């Protein structure tokens, strides 16, 4: 796993062992090709950051700041180590339950990215829906984007068929078993 483009292009990202499922290079590359026009100077919140691969890619490509949040101590340690070794400026790592973090954060972001753990069985928590129903809306700038990675066809994979008050699904891209959902805040 590596940073694909920008100031830190080619940097090898250290990934923690265990249940972490980092966003694949090809999915990140496609995501950032879409975001490229709005990325320079953007303030980004990366929820369920894992090793920090999405946040690091954003900083490498010109984001002004990235706040990376994850509940797992090991993931946060790896994200901090990756941030330090990549020598990218403007990143911070917060160890916190992401749903609780959203309830208390006072920041404003241009882009919020969430890649929560995939549902493994029927009835598992739909963390993307929980985020969208909470105060995530308040953390975005007026022209901000919420981008979620979900698993195709299981658990939250059908989220695109649901409507959430205050949100408009503007794009959906599928890469293998991953779906990237792009939402805009409605005024």
Task: Indicate residue ranges for each PLM-predicted region.
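Class I S-adenosyl-L-methionine-dependent methyltransferase catalytic core
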Residues: 1-187
């Amino acid at each position: 796993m590596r940073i694909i483009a920008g100031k830190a292009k080619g940097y090898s990202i250290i990934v923690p062992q265990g249940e972490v499922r980092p966003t694949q290079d090809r999915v990140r590359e496609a995501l950032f090709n879409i975001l490229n026009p709005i990325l320079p100077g953007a303030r980004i919140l990366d929820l369920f950051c894992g090793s920090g691969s999405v946040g690091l890619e954003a900083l490498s490509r010109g984001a002004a700041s990235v706040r990376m949040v994850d509940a797992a101590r090991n993931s946060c340690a790896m994200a901090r180590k990756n941030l330090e070794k990549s020598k990218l400026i403007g990143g911070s790592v917060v160890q916190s339950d992401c749903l609780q973090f959203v309830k208390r954060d006072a920041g404003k972001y241009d882009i919020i990215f969430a890649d929560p753990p995939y549902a493994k069985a029927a009835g598992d928590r739909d963390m993307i829906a929980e985020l969208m129903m909470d105060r995530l809306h308040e953390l975005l700038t007026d022209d901000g984007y919420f981008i979620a990675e979900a698993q195709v066809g299981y658990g939250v994979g059908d989220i695109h068929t649901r409507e959430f008050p205050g949100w408009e699904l503007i794009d959906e891209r599928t890469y293998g078993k991953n779906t990237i959902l792009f939402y805009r805040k409605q005024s």
